[in-house]
Amino acid sequence: MSSQYSNVENLSPQTIRQVMRELQEMETTPPEGIKVLINESDVTDIQALIDGPAGTPYAVGIFRVKLTLSKDFPQTPPKAYFLTKIFHPNVAGNGEICVNTLKKDWKPDLGIKHILLTIKCLLIVPNPESALNEEAGKMLLERYDDYSQRARMMTEIHAQPAKCGVGAASDAKDDDGPSTKKHAGLDKKLQDKKKEKLLKEKKRMLKRL
């Protein structure tokens, strides 16, 4: 998914070079559980895949996120969005992410890697006091088991590898070789059957909520 509006022409050549350099470094040496998806024709369209951290309701998921750079970047922070549907206190219905790093704590030298790591940390430690999703924030504080079940259900429905179009962020490769393509059809059929069964189970769970 590419951005509808690009600010690439409004960024200075120095900023564009810096962003591309950082993205290429992350592609070569990715942070654990994070894979950047480089759009070389538009560096203002930054997307990445984040593995759901172990021990959280998001653990089985892979989440696609997007950063949108403004014309004043890096003096002003980018906006960050989850493109994958997620039940989380700090993620609005449109996917916008609320985190202090992208607001009052922003510093021009933080960089793209720091932002993505902060988003991953938000999956581990949500901040219900500054909730964009008030239902999720209230549920986390008052009925954590229900919150965890709801977040896990959303993860299992919306954040599976097939939804992102690739494998896990820690395993995904840029070069899908013949073996990958050969088995893609079979894998998709198995995943579709698994998802169909999972959706039926989740519908039954929702009726009881």
From Swiss-Prot:
Q: Reaction(s) catalyzed by this protein?
A: S-ubiquitinyl-[E1 ubiquitin-activating enzyme]-L-cysteine + [E2 ubiquitin-conjugating enzyme]-L-cysteine = [E1 ubiquitin-activating enzyme]-L-cysteine + S-ubiquitinyl-[E2 ubiquitin-conjugating enzyme]-L-cysteine
Q: Where is the composition biased (Basic and acidic residues)?
A: 171-194
Q: Does the keyword Nucleotide-binding apply?
A: yes
The terms under GO molecular function for this entry are: ATP binding; ubiquitin conjugating enzyme activity
**Mind listing the UniProt keywords for this protein, alphabetically?**
ATP-binding, Cell cycle, Cell division, Nucleotide-binding, Transferase, Ubl conjugation pathway
Annotated pathway:
Protein modification; protein ubiquitination
Q: Where is the active site?
A: C98
Q: Which domain of life is it from?
A: Eukaryota
Per the record's keyword annotation, is Nucleotide-binding included, yes or no? Answer: yes
Which InterPro entries does the record associate with it? Answer: Ub_conjugating_enzyme, UBQ-conjugat_E2_core, UBQ-conjugating_AS, UBQ-conjugating_enzyme/RWD
Entry's Gene Ontology BP terms:
anaphase-promoting complex-dependent catabolic process; cell division; exit from mitosis; protein ubiquitination
Q: Where is this region: Disordered?
A: 165-194
Record-listed E.C. numbers:
2.3.2.23
Show the SMART domains listed in the entry.
Answer: UBCc
What EC class does the entry list?
A: transferase
What family is this protein classified in?
Belongs to the ubiquitin-conjugating enzyme family.
Describe the task this protein carries out.
Catalyzes the covalent attachment of ubiquitin to other proteins. Acts as an essential factor of the anaphase promoting complex/cyclosome (APC/C), a cell cycle-regulated ubiquitin ligase that controls progression through mitosis. Acts by specifically elongating polyubiquitin chains initiated by the E2 enzyme vih/UbcH10 on APC/C substrates, enhancing the degradation of APC/C substrates by the proteasome and promoting mitotic exit.
Protein name per Swiss-Prot or TrEMBL: Ubiquitin-conjugating enzyme E2 S
